[in-house]
Amino acid sequence: FTPESRLKLFEKWIKYQSIPANIDIEFGGDNEEQVNSLNFVTQAFIISIMLMAALLVTQFNNFYQMTIILSAVVLSTAGVMLGLLIFDQVFSALLTGIGIVSLAGIVVNNNIILIDSFNVISSKSNEDVRTRIIKACAQRLRPIFLTSLTTMLGLIPLALNYSIDPIAREIAYDSNASTSWAPLAQCIIYGISFSAILTLVLTPCLLVLPDHIKEIISKYRKPSFA
């Protein structure tokens, strides 16, 4: 049991109680710490996004590609929420929040690798944009999957509440250390797995979108007569 799950049950119980209107109920202790932690993590998340956006704009000199790269952060956050929902797990303001902030710096690497390969191919080739995107995806498919897979495999023992003590030569289950850090590992696994798959689907679509829009406009634009 976690403080968050116990608090939710207690809040549901309070709703069905006949409490006088002049009595205010406030939750302190762990709940107050959770609120403060969530505020801190939210501020850290916003600052990290702003710093990454500034760095990516200066590096790629392209606002649209910067937006595509940062879309991985949205995908990873959605993956975390979806994973918590599927496995009926509680959102920890501190550990899950730290995991989301950490993911912001991890998952953008896949998009950076893919878009950088696309830019390199585009600078050396005059092929159709779809052909260039397919080549970039073919070149970076294995690196993206390998880096994501190795990260997830390394975190699986901790996510399953296993801790390994190499000095004592022991493998413990549901220990204090593993229970405390399991939400962080689970958060990163959900975010990376969801983002890695959708990156190879959504990013190529977003890269081809400007050219596709231009084709549609040129197709329906009325011809001008002298």
Task: Give the label of every model feature segment.
Residues 163-179, 205-226:
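Interfacial helix-loop-helix hairpins and adjacent transmembrane helices
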Residues 49-50, 189:
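Core hydrophobic alpha-helical membrane-spanning segments
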Residues 180, 184-185:
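Structured binding elements
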Residues 1, 32, 119, 151, ...:
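Short, glycine-/Ser/Thr-/acidic-enriched flexible segments
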Residues 12-15, 19, 43, 75-76, ...:
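Residue-level marker of structural boundaries
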Residues 1-48, 54-60, 66, 130-132:
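Extracytoplasmic/periplasmic membrane-proximal domains and adjacent transmembrane bundles
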Residues 54-140, 145-164, 172, 190, ...:
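Hydrophobic transmembrane alpha-helices and their membrane-interface caps
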